[in-house]
Amino acid sequence: MIILGIDPGLAILGYGIINYEGNRFKVLDYGAITTPSTMATPERLKTIYRELDRIITEYNPDTVAIEELFFNTNVKTALLVGHARGVAVLSAANHNKEIFEYTPLQVKQGVVGYGRADKSQIQQMVKTLLNLTKVPKPDDVADALAVAICHAHTGNFTEMFKIK
């Protein structure tokens, strides 16, 4: 099963594509889609959409897993991240992909087995599980790979996390 994991963001959207078969992970690609703050928001969203469209076309993932937004005290930031998340969901939906969402707590539990794990613990587990030589940077990329791993580990419970 090919899984595209997404950590949404307007300035930096992390993505990671893994193949999960027989309890084994293989990394196909990972990276970040970045947009400068000097660019108008609609143009930034178009850039994210185009890049995700290209990635989905190239790798044809079976499913897309995206991190849910957590409550942010900065309303403007939360709205902008929400816009980027919406564009990511739209891109996947336009390719008729099943889309699943996970909270940060669920991602931590799915990757490390502990919901209060810190960022460095998650990053080290991503590195270990995916047999990488170093932790992917920026952090958003490691987070996206963690979302994909979480989805793979969810197994038969995926229907609970499907966006309907």
From Swiss-Prot:
- Tell me the active site: 7, 67, 140
Q: Where is the signal peptide?
A: none
- Cofactor descriptive note: Binds 2 Mg(2+) ion per subunit.
Q: Which residues form a coiled coil?
A: none
What GO terms are given for molecular function?
Answer: crossover junction DNA endonuclease activity; DNA binding; magnesium ion binding
Taken from the UniProt entry, a GO cellular component term is:
Holliday junction resolvase complex
EC top class, in one word?
hydrolase
Write out the entry's keywords from A to Z: Cytoplasm, DNA damage, DNA recombination, DNA repair, DNA-binding, Endonuclease, Hydrolase, Magnesium, Metal-binding, Nuclease
Q: What's a BP term from Gene Ontology annotated to this protein?
A: DNA repair
Compartments where found: Cytoplasm
Q: Does the keyword Protein biosynthesis apply?
A: no
Catalytic activity reads:
Endonucleolytic cleavage at a junction such as a reciprocal single-stranded crossover between two homologous DNA duplexes (Holliday junction)
Q: Which cofactor does it need?
A: Mg(2+)
Q: Which residues bind Mg(2+) 2?
A: 67
- Enzyme Commission no: 3.1.21.10
Q: What is this protein called?
A: Crossover junction endodeoxyribonuclease RuvC
